[in-house]
């Protein structure tokens, strides 16, 4: 399936010089969304996975759909202050400052899911957060990997993705 044809390029958003990869058209296509849920993690033995952890906000959509498809739980990785206590928090650097994400503590094996991997800062923070909160990270996956911006791996494997730029 040609997923790139369902991802809209939005030039100069959110600021000049950036090309935003809008996955809204893909999400509106039930066949494409199902394809993503069934094919993004072909390399992972999901029998050992308890949860799909989605990074706010578009990662929520993908992870929740994948969790339902594979009959697993869903964990929200949220911006700080959005979840009731208790939570664990991790701060990380952004191009223009810092950010903080949080997750309820717990146990189990997770796959972390997000929409786009750019520099890897948010995804690495999510990995660190899951480990801090008591979870074991089985794999990480993104719909779109901007490979020209990163060479990120996890456990000596490339981050799973279905679309690369």
UniProtKB/Swiss-Prot annotation:
Catalysed reaction equations from the record: AMP + diphosphate = 5-phospho-alpha-D-ribose 1-diphosphate + adenine
Q: In which pathway does it act?
A: Purine metabolism; AMP biosynthesis via salvage pathway; AMP from adenine: step 1/1
Report the protein name in the record: Adenine phosphoribosyltransferase
Q: Which InterPro entries match?
A: Ade_phspho_trans (IPR005764), PRibTrfase_dom (IPR000836), PRTase-like (IPR029057), UPRTase/APRTase (IPR050054)
Origin organism is Bdellovibrio bacteriovorus (strain ATCC 15356 / DSM 50701 / NCIMB 9529 / HD100)
Pfam family for this entry, one: Pribosyltran
Q: Where is the signal peptide?
A: none
Q: Which family, according to UniProt?
A: Belongs to the purine/pyrimidine phosphoribosyltransferase family.
| The protein's Enzyme Commission number | 2.4.2.7
